[in-house]
Amino acid sequence: MLNPIVRKFQYGQHTVTLETGMMARQATAAVMVSMDDTAVFVTVVGQKKAKPGQDFFPLTVNYQERTYAAGRIPGSFFRREGRPSEGETLIARLIDRPIRPLFPEGFVNEVQVIATVVSVNPQVNPDIVAMIGASAALSLSGIPFNGPIGAARVGYINDQYVLNPTQDELKESKLDLVVAGTEAAVLMVESEAELLSEDQMLGAVVFGHEQQQVVIQNINELVKEAGKPRWDWQPEPVNEALNARVAALAEARLSDAYRITDKQERYAQVDVIKSETIATLLAEDETLDENELGEILHAIEKNVVRSRVLAGEPRIDGREKDMIRGLDVRTGVLPRTHGSALFTRGETQALVTATLGTARDAQVLDELMGERTDTFLFHYNFPPYSVGETGMVGSPKRREIGHGRLAKRGVLAVMPDMDKFPYTVRVVSEITESNGSSSMASVCGASLALMDAGVPIKAAVAGIAMGLVKEGDNYVVLSDILGDEDHLGDMDFKVAGSRDGISALQMDIKIEGITKEIMQVALNQAKGARLHILGVMEQAINAPRGDISEFAPRIHTIKINPDKIKDVIGKGGSVIRALTEETGTTIEIEDDGTVKIAATDGEKAKHAIRRIEEITAEIEVGRVYTGKVTRIVDFGAFVAIGGGKEGLVHISQIADKRVEKVTDYLQMGQEVPVKVLEVDRQGRIRLSIKEATEQSQPAAAPEAPAAEQGE
C-alpha cells in the first residue's frame, strides 16, 4: 500500500535523499529530504480554486523545528513548542524568497508550504535541506510553478570555496553564503562575510549556482517518476480594449505625477488619478471590476517608471542612475544613551542607539543545533508612522526580524573580539522615516552609534540598496533605490561593508536572465556608493571615541589562581554575594580564573579588586599580619587576618607568661599583631601574638599576587 519513491545523490561532502509517497498522502505533495541525518519533512497544499475577489498571491511558508529532532524535550513551562523563534522565522523567509517569483503572474490560488525538522545532525544546518524539500514538493505537486530551484551554502576556507560546509567548518570560514536559483538563473543570495572583495563574493554566488545543478537534475528525475499532473490553470485573458481605454485616460497623467519628487505629494497625486480614472470608467460601465482596473493602473505605473529609466531619463526624484540621495549624519543625539546616531538619506531616516552591558546581559539561545550565547544583539523597529500610516504596534513582524538580521550581518564582521572588549552590545534601530532601504540605513546608523559609544569596531561600515530595470538586453542598474523603484524593478540588491570589503550581501531577483556581468556591474556600482557614504560618515565621526560613556558599566579584568575561585565564590555563593553588595559592582568569574568586575564608578571597581586580591592572597608562614579577634574560646582566640581567612591563637601563644583567662588579654573586635606559625594540609592556620610582639613591623594585610588589570 505504501509505495515510497526514493532518489539518492551526492551533494558536496553529503548524501542527499529525496523520498515521497510514504507520508501525508492527502497533501497536494509531500517530500522527506535528508542530508546526513538531518531530515526535513516538507508538505505543500494548494487550493484548486482562488477565492472570489482575490487580488494578491496568498503564499504562506511555515518552517518549524521540533526538539525531538535533537533528542530533547522543550524547556518551556508547557513542555511543547510555541510560537516560531527568530531563527525559524528567518529560515521561513529564506524558503519563501526564491520560490515566490516562480509562480505565474495572475495565479492567486492559496498555497501553503510547511517544513518540519524531524531529525538533526548538529553538523548539518536544516535550512538548505528545507529549501530543497520545498522545491521538490512544489515541483511534484502539479501546482503551476516554474521551478525547481536548487539551494547551496558556500564557505570560503584557505582561499577556496567550500560547498555546504559543516558547522565546524563554518567557524573557520570567512564567508557564510546561501544561494538559490533555477537551472538558468540565480534568484536569491543571503550572506555574511569577513570583508571579502566584490570578485570573491561574486565568485561564491557563481560557484554555489553551478554546484546546485545536481539538486535540480535529481528533483526533475523524481518528478518524472512521481510527479502529479500539471494543473490545467490558465491566466485570465487580457482585455486589450479595456487596457487601451485605461491607458488613454491615465497614462499621460501618471507620467506627470511620477515627476513629483516628494514621496507624499506624489502618492497623493497618484491616488487622485487612480480614483478619478476608476470613477470615470465605472460611470461608463458599471459591470467593470474595480480590482481589475487597479491592476491595469498598477501595470501602467510600472511601465511609466521603467521605460523612463531605460531611456536614460532622470529617475522619479530627478537623480541620475548612480546618484545617492542627500545625506545628513549626526552622532550623540540622545544624552543618556551609551551611543546614538541619526542617519538620514533622502526620505529614509534611522535613529540608532548602542547600549553596553556585561556578560550577564548576553542572550542564551537554546537552538536545535545546540545552545549558544549571543553577545551582539541587533533589533530593528519599523513603526507605521515611518511611512505616514496608522497601524498595529507590538511584537516584531517577520519583515522586522529579517531586516534586523540583515543589518546585524552588515556590522558583525567589524565587531571587536570579546577578550579585547568584554561587553554585551545591543543596537536598536528605530526607523523614523522610510522610502527605500531602511535596513542599509540601519547599518550606517549602527556603525555611527557604536563609534559614539566608544566600541572599538575594526572599521566603519555602510550599506546601500541597488535596483535593476531590464527589458531584453537593455538594462540599467540604479544606486540607492526608492521604495517605488524597489517595487517596480527586477532586482533588490543590498550590499554592506567597509572600505576594505563586503560584510553582507542580500539579493532578491524577480526575473530570469540576470547574468554574471550584470551582477558585476551592480557590485562595482555599489562599491562606489558605499565609499561615498563612508566619506560623509567619517566627517561626522572618523574613529571610535577614546572612552566609553560615563553612563555605561566599566569592566575591569583581573586574573586569579583558578584554585582560589572557590574562596571568592564562597559556600553557596555567600562570599561573592557579600562582595557585590559591599562594593556595588557586578562580578563574574570564568573557569580559567579571569574575573570581570563591572561598575559605573571607578572607585567601586578598585574597592572590589582590592577585596578580591585580599581573599586570594597566599598566607606566608613566618610573616606578621594585623588581625581582628572574631571569636574567643576557652583554649584561645580566633583572629581574622584579611581576605576572609581566620587562624587560631592558642592560649599558650597569647603572651610570654601563663594566661589563665583569654578575656583578660583579648576582647572581641580587638586588633592585634599575629605571626603565622603554620598552615597545615587542610588550610588551618596557627597564629601567635607572643612571637609577633617580638617583631616590631607588622604587615597591614596579606600581600596580593600582581593583578593583570585592564579596562
Swiss-Prot record:
SUPFAM superfamilies: Eukaryotic type KH-domain (KH-domain type I), Nucleic acid-binding proteins, Polynucleotide phosphorylase/guanosine pentaphosphate synthase (PNPase/GPSI), domain 3, Ribonuclease PH domain 2-like, Ribosomal protein S5 domain 2-like
Domain S1 motif as annotated: residue spans: 622-690
Region (Disordered): 689-711
Annotated ranges, domain KH: 553-612
Chief place of localization: cytoplasm
GO biological process, alphabetically ordered: mRNA catabolic process; RNA processing
Keywords from the UniProt entry: Cytoplasm, Magnesium, Metal-binding, Nucleotidyltransferase, RNA-binding, Transferase
A Pfam family matched in the record: S1
Gene Ontology terms, MF aspect: 3'-5'-RNA exonuclease activity; magnesium ion binding; polyribonucleotide nucleotidyltransferase activity; RNA binding
Listed SMART domains: KH, S1
Transmembrane segments: none
Binding residues annotated for Mg(2+), in chain numbering: 486, 492
Biased composition (Low complexity): 694-711
Catalytic reaction(s) noted: RNA(n+1) + phosphate = RNA(n) + a ribonucleoside 5'-diphosphate
GO cellular component: cytosol
Alphabetized Gene3D superfamilies for the sequence: GHMP Kinase, N-terminal domain (3.30.230.70), K Homology domain, type 1 (3.30.1370.10), Nucleic acid-binding proteins (2.40.50.140)
Subunit text: Component of the RNA degradosome, which is a multiprotein complex involved in RNA processing and mRNA degradation.
Family, as annotated: Belongs to the polyribonucleotide nucleotidyltransferase family.
UniProt cross-references to HAMAP family, sorted A to Z: PNPase
The protein's role, per its UniProt record: Involved in mRNA degradation. Catalyzes the phosphorolysis of single-stranded polyribonucleotides processively in the 3'- to 5'-direction.
Protein name in UniProt: Polyribonucleotide nucleotidyltransferase
Natural source organism: Escherichia coli O139:H28 (strain E24377A / ETEC)
Chain's gene name: pnp
